[in-house]
């Protein structure tokens, strides 16, 4: 019984830790000015093996599950709400590309706090590493799948001269 209480207490504190840390990281991430995401940083580059996002769908079937991921805007009003996308124009697509970069960065950073569990028991470490990966890697994959497709759409719109609606 004493061991069960200890596990429940540990689970509660770990849950609260992740809730507070991830909400704060997301909140801070939304405050990063867009201009930093307009830069061409290597972390956001689509690598050759990704084949413009096709890799992610081929190996992880992204199209089948990406719509099931909770929209961050429901938890944080500062997060871009893509449901309000009324027109497809270069400004909106550029904003969406910026937001894929922001989301990817936020979720990479959200994995790092797992370090705090380094001194914990093996079970606590494994559970928290598993949680950090399962909560963040799928969102990173979706961003890496969507961004090259949005970039290609942006190129097409610019070629057609559809600057603004």
Curated annotation (Swiss-Prot):
GO molecular function per UniProt: acyltransferase activity
Record carries keyword Cell membrane: yes
GO annotation terms (biological process): carotenoid biosynthetic process
InterPro entries for the chain: CrtO (IPR044021)
A Gene Ontology term for the protein's cellular component: plasma membrane
Keyword Cell membrane found: yes
Subcellular location: Cell membrane
Enzyme Commission number: 2.3.1.-
Signal peptide: 1-28
Membrane topology per record: Single-pass membrane protein
Keywords from the named record: Acyltransferase, Carotenoid biosynthesis, Cell membrane, Membrane, Signal, Transferase, Transmembrane, Transmembrane helix
Pathway linked to the protein: Carotenoid biosynthesis; staphyloxanthin biosynthesis; staphyloxanthin from farnesyl diphosphate: step 5/5
Membrane-spanning intervals of the chain: 126-145
Function description: Catalyzes the acylation of glycosyl-4,4'-diaponeurosporenoate, i.e. the esterification of glucose at the C6'' position with the carboxyl group of the C(15) fatty acid 12-methyltetradecanoic acid, to yield staphyloxanthin. This is the last step in the biosynthesis of this orange pigment, present in most staphylococci strains.
Official protein name in the record: Glycosyl-4,4'-diaponeurosporenoate acyltransferase
Source organism of the structure: Staphylococcus aureus (strain N315)
